Each structure stands twice: as C-alpha cells, then as structure tokens.
Amino acid sequence: MYSDRRHTRKRQRLLVVGVFLVLLLLALAGVLFALSNSSDSAKKETDNASNKEAKADKKDSSGNSGGEPGKKNNGAKKSESDKSGSNVKLGDKPEAVKGIYMSAYTVGGNLDAYLDFTDSTEINAMVIDVKDVTGEVMYPSEVPLANEIGATREVLPDLKTLTKQLDDRGVYSIARIAVFEDDILPRERPDLAPTDSSTGEPWLNDAGQAWSDGYNKKVWEYNVAIAKEAAEAGFDEVQFDYIRFPSDGPLDTLEYKKTPFPNDQTALGEFLKYADKELEPTGARIAADVFGLAATEDGAGVGQYMNKLAPHLDVVNPMTYPSHYPIGSFGYDNPNAQPYEMVRESMKDFEEDTEKVNPDIEIRPWIQDFDLGDPPYGPAEIQAQMQAVYDSNETGWLLWNPSNVYTEGALKPADSNEPTTAEETTTQ
C-alpha cells in the first residue's frame, strides 16, 4: 500500500514537471514568434521607406528638395482632411504645377520636342486634349456610346503608353475633356441635345457648333466614362472644360427637353458631384475650367457658381486671359494692357468665393501666352500674370496658346532656384 502511494506521488510530480516544461516551451515559442514579427515589420517599414524615396527620386528629376517649388518637384500633397466633405486625391504631384496646353495632334506628332522643353524649363505638367469641343475622342476608346456615334479617333498613342512616357520624364499629366460643347454627340443623338424651337433640330451656337444637354444624365455618364478611362490609364488629373451652358447664339430659341433641376448652376454642381463619386476610386484629381469672371459676376451667365462647383473639385482653373475681359473690367479701359491687375483681381474673387465652401481647393489659373489686341504679349506680360498668381498665395499656373507655341523667354530654366512665392518676391 505504501509503495503504491509513493509511486502515485512520483507520477504526480512527473506530471507537474511535464506540464511546466510544456508551458515553458510555449512561452519561448511565443517570444520567438514576436521577435520574428517585429523583425519582419521593421524590414517592411525600411523597404516601404526605400520605395517611397525611390519613387520621389524618379518623379523629381531636377534634384530639388521636397519644399522647393522648382521643376519636377514631387512636393507636398493636399491635406487628407477635406473640409468640403469630398474625398481628396493623394497622388504624387509637383509642389507647384506649371503646365502647358497640348492639343492631341501636337502630342501625337511632336511629343518628344515638348518633353525636351519640360527638361530645359520650369514647365512640369501637360494638359492634353482627350476629348475636344468637336466631340472627337482622341484615342480608341472602349466607351460604347463613343463608338456608336463614331467619335473615336487614333490621334493619341495608347493612353497607358502616353502616361508612362510622361511619368518617366517627371511630367504631371492632365486629361482635358470638353464636356457639354460637343459637335458629334448632339448630331448623332438628338435626344441628348437641346432643341432649336425654330427648326426642331439640335440647337447651334453662332459658330454653328452643337451642344449636348447639360441636364441629361446620359450625357453626364458619357463624359465621365471617358474621364474614367483616362484616369485608369494613368492620368494624374482630369480637367473638365466647357462645364457650362451656352453663352452665345440664338439663346431665345434654345429649349431643353427636361429640366430636372431648379437652375443651371445646380445641374452643373450635381454633374461634378457625380463625377467626383465615379472618379474617386481612380485617385485622379478633379479640376474644372471656368470663366475668369465667374467669381466676379455670379456664374458669368453660364451656371458657373463657385458655391455649387467648388465643393466637388480639387482644382479650379479660372481662364484669366486679360484679352478676354470686357472694357471697364475692374476699372480698366484696356484689360489686355493690365496683365497683372486682371489676374490678381480675379484671383481675389475666386479666393473669396471658394473660402467658405472648399478652403482647401487649389486655384490654378490659365494665363495668356498669345496675342489678341494691343499690346502683343511677350515675356514681361506673361511674367506679370505669373507674379499675380504668386501674390495671391498660389504657386501654380497653366499657359494657354491654341497653337502650342510658348514663350520660352518667360520661363525660368529647369535648375533655377529663384523664388516663386509671394513672401519671397516683389510685384513687378
């Protein structure tokens, strides 16, 4: 009996020791697992940091630091906190976007020369026609309606190839899409166009150009589908032009089939709201071209009210060409002779109009690099407009010349370290 109890106690002690050893081994295994995860996590963080640095180096071919607004600067991103409530796009972009307009035909035939131009000057962005006011879609789009109406062309190379070319050279890519002025869609699909009440045919402006119906959601879907193709192909930004209602022509005979919104500005705002939602997954920024007087004259008569448009935009592009302002604008008899004043006064109004509805919006104006009226425009007039932008606490601008011939003498060289902010410069 005593021997049995002794063997029982021995077995109990062995069991306790065995359990202790098992627990000890499990604890050691847990420590080793934690150390392994910590090492892997640290390695991933190091690899991610290295990848980000490599990407930044690729985008910043000029070698400038992140805070310098020089050429090809990767720059700061917009705040992740968008006070307007819409999603902010977080793709790489230069600290200061300084771009030129490029027709699809120029890109299709002479892109390399313009890429060299960006290498030698402060230009770091291109605005490229993807769909223009003729209604032509400048690449072989897969959007069904574009093919149904015969709008597609093969002017541009494959969009993915094009955006890779631009990205490899550190050029920020912007796809320009003319929305409601469109000479193909209304003629092929009159049900998607306003009607001329005197003829029963699609309404035409003074230039004989047709317009699509800005109230019609099928028209919205068509243009946004093209925008999505461009964004998914790699364009950094989508710029909607002719995001307005007609301004010239026999407006008294202009009739819409349905007007499901209380006014034109609400329709435009709802279009941009829809575009913002559809494009959000692509990460592309959304921009819109507007009249230079849109903020000064409450929509400029075409529905471009900033309180409706700005909440759904990352960028607004006022077309502040001094030659386009009517006599007497801001008190000047010859606006074309006041390049600084026209841009500066317009920028003030846009800042005031957007502050309450989207204080984070970038105001990046189109400025004039062409001759129309007196005086002709050279480096001094172009630089005066740029200075007006800097004095408005903005850093980016876009040069417009319909022939894509730009005044190199107005531009800084690519390696220039000259200041371009209001705090560091003086007004001309």
Feature names for model-found ranges:
Residues 1-14:
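N-terminal Lys/Arg-rich, disordered targeting/topogenic segments
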Residues 36-37, 313-327, 336-344, 349-428:
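Substrate-binding cleft of secreted/luminal carbohydrate-active enzymes
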Residues 90-102, 180-229:
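Active-site-adjacent "subsite" loops/lids of carbohydrate-active enzymes
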Residues 110-137, 231-238, 312-315, 389-397:
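Catalytic domains of carbohydrate-active enzymes, especially glycoside hydrolases
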Residues 121-155, 247:
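Aromatic-lined carbohydrate-binding/catalytic grooves of carbohydrate-active enzymes
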Residues 125-127, 157-202, 239:
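Glycine-rich, aromatic-flanked loop segments that form ligand/cofactor-binding clefts
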Residues 138-149, 182-204, 248-259:
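Aromatic- and acidic-residue-enriched segments that line the glycan-binding/catalytic groove
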Residues 172-178, 182, 239, 262-302, ...:
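Aromatic-lined carbohydrate-recognition surfaces of secreted/lumenal glycan-active proteins
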